[in-house]
A protein has these predicted regions:
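Primarily the internal scaffold of c-type cytochrome electron-transfer domains
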Residues: 30-38, 63-93, 124-443, 449-453, ...
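Cytoplasmic C-terminal tails of single-pass
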Residues: 593-597
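C-terminal low-complexity, Ser/Thr- and acidic/Pro-rich disordered "stalk" regions positioned immediately N-terminal
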Residues: 532-564
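Juxtamembrane/start-of-transmembrane alpha-helix segments at the extracytoplasmic/lumenal side
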Residues: 562-575
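A cross-kingdom C-terminal cell-surface attachment/processing module
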Residues: 573-591
Length: 597
């Protein structure tokens, strides 16, 4: 699979001379021409159908409270179904078009296949930032965008090939439709199909190392597919083998469902069209837009519950992506003493964490001390919610992110001009062997099985206990995810010289909690401060500790399908606290009895 990606990238590079000739902002429109169905390519056949027509006539239940096999239910409230309404994407699109006129057309190949194939992304100078799109084009990755797609050897970079006929492809050979013929296709169940829009490089920019050395690759924008294809998740027979569809289009898990509301054919265990990812915040922004009468034909308060359900599914996906455990922590310590704590975060997803469009996305570990009154003092990974600011000056901060930039310039957010990776500390998936030039930068994940990168990271902290602390103190570690940062949003607003998209994004950002971090996983351990534990108090273990240390910890996060020896402790923070208090009380009673004797 990686060979096909390489061939596809080589072909794309060969087209550069006629595609993009310079990177100056004053140049004329220059479009990226790649294989696949071209603008006007369906002129001899039916155009891509309006997605709302698919939903209203056949594939919509209007019930957000139940698991639904109706494709429109999940799709319409997914980021795929709103790929041309996402305020963050639109703001970034305008900046890209300012920096490299014509580059927006390349983005729109994925974000609105109907608009691109319909010829409405090149029809004027402003078209490549979406100025000439029709209302139906705003539905993003529509039903026909996938269900008329045919297999191609050109993976990635939106090089899709669409059927010029009325036939819709799906998993079933027999359908009962009064609107269109159908045919079975294995392509829709193949992860290579997902590479179409989730393996994206910039044909206009090389990928350079920090010293300016050319890697021979193009600059990566979204490499989720190759992260998967070069991991154990893509290996048949692997204990973790799974396709993109297995995770992001889960099966309902029950018989007797129909994907239509007309002449239904019942299917057993069909797939949902939720396409749940990591962007719960984006879906809640879109829900607010659905409830805003100023958004025109997008205004639909009845659709809001579907977006809230989609956001909840995204949060569930985040919780399944990593596990967190305290591998080492002392069971007792003196007030004011420094203690050593080791936390392990493990990637349980089939790609890097975080993945996808990485500008602004990040995961970090927050470490806090929690006293018996449940007052928390953050000692590493502090996030100021009032300012939407993460303290990156913290010397112990564990931050997992990809930072783009330009050779000779450094870190910057002009996506169309990126040509180097300043930092890439994202967690690899299990068994990951990256493409040349895609290795971690600023982090060492060597030591995985069989020469692969490790899919976990051990974070070591030195924490000084409060001098006034007495009794049980809980060490709490949380893995926190943020889909975008204040700095990135403000950049998109500040640099916009063309339209109001940046300011509109900033307004929506301020009104929606500023993309507050979401806690993916948590682990805790209790330290008795100022009084030793009795010898017969017992211990609580959670997977052991470094150098045989006792670990009274509770771990959370990750999928529910744990293997033996990989189970989170059943004792949560409250249980561990109760245990510690009971042990201390028992010791006090024994001392009292000895004194009475």
């Amino acid at each position: 699979m990686s060979t096909r990606i390489q061939r596809s990238r080589t072909r794309a590079s060969a087209l550069l001379a006629s595609a993009l000739l310079a990177t100056g902002a004053a140049q004329a429109q220059q479009y990226i021409n790649l294989p696949g169905t071209q603008p006007g390519g369906l002129a001899e056949g039916p155009p891509l159908e309006n997605a709302r027509s698919c939903g209203v006539t056949c594939h919509y239940s209007r019930d957000a409270t139940m698991p639904s096999a109706m494709p429109y239910d999940g799709w319409s409230s997914s980021m795929m179904g709103n790929a041309m309404r996402d305020p963050l994407f639109l703001a970034a699109l305008t900046i890209a078009e300012q920096d490299l006129p014509g580059s927006g057309d390349y983005c729109l190949r994925c974000h609105t296949p109907p608009g691109f194939v319909g010829g409405r992304t090149r029809s004027s100078a402003a078209a490549s930032r979406g100025a000439d799109l029709e209302s139906a084009d705003l539905d993003g990755v529509t039903c026909d965008s996938c269900h008329r797609m045919t297999e191609t050897a050109n993976l990635g970079n939106a090089q899709y090939v669409l059927s010029p006929t009325e036939t819709r492809f799906g998993p079933y050979a027999t359908i009962n439709s009064i609107r269109h013929p159908g045919a079975a296709s294995t392509w829709l169940a193949d992860s290579r199909m997902c590479a179409t829009c989730h393996e994206i490089t910039n044909p206009a920019q090389p990928l350079l190392r920090a010293d300016g050395t050319d890697t021979g690759q193009r600059y990566p924008i979204d490499t989720t597919y190759s992260e998967w294809s070069r991991s154990d998740y893509a290996v048949a027979g692997s204990p973790v083998a799974a396709t993109c569809q297995d995770c992001h289009m889960p099966r309902i898990g029950a018989p007797g469902y129909s994907a239509t509301n007309t002449t239904a054919m019942m299917r057993d265990n069909p797939r949902r069209h939720d396409f749940a990812g990591a962007n719960a915040w984006g879906l809640r922004v879109l829900a607010a837009m659905r409830n805003d009468v100023t958004t025109g034909d997008f205004y639909d308060p009845e659709a809001v519950p579907f977006y809230e359900a989609g956001a909840a599914r995204a949060e569930a996906t985040l919780r399944s992506a990593v596990t967190l455990e305290l591998r080492s922590a002392p069971t007792q310590a003196d007030p004011g003493a420094p203690v050593e704590v080791v936390a392990r975060i493990t990637n349980r997803s089939g790609h890097r964490v975080p993945s996808g469009y990485t500008d602004g996305r990040r995961v970090w570990l927050e470490v806090a001390l929690v006293d018996s009154s449940n007052r928390a003092t953050v000692v590493s990974g502090a996030y100021d919610a009032a300012e939407a600011h993460l303290d990156e000056t913290d010397p112990q901060l564990k931050l997992y992110e990809a930072v783009p930039g330009r050779v000779g310039v450094g870190r910057e957010e002009h996506i169309a001009l990126h040509n180097t990776t300043i930092r890439d500390t994202r967690l690899p998936p299990r068994g990951y062997r990256p493409l040349p030039g895609h290795e971690p930068v600023g982090a060492d994940y060597s030591g995985g099985e069989g020469g692969a990168l490790r899919h976990w990271d051990d974070a070591r902290y030195t924490i000084t206990l409060p001098a006034t602390a007495r009794g049980p103190v809980t060490v709490r570690v949380r893995a926190r995810f943020q889909v975008t940062t204040r700095e990135y949003v403000e950049f998109l607003a500040r640099e916009n010289r063309t339209d109001d998209r940046g300011r509109e994004l900033l307004r929506r950002y301020e009104a929606s909690g500023r993309a507050a971090p979401y806690d993916m996983a948590e682990a805790t351990a209790v330290i008795m401060v100022g009084a030793p534990l009795p010898e017969d108090a017992g211990t609580v273990r959670d997977g052991g500790g470094a150098d045989g240390a006792v670990v009274p910890a509770a771990a959370s996060g990750g999928c529910s399908c744990h293997t033996a020896g990989d189970q989170p402790s059943a004792r949560g923070g409250a249980g561990a606290l109760f245990f510690a208090l009971a042990a201390a009380l028992s010791a006090r009673r024994r001392r009292a009895r000895r004194n009475d004797a």
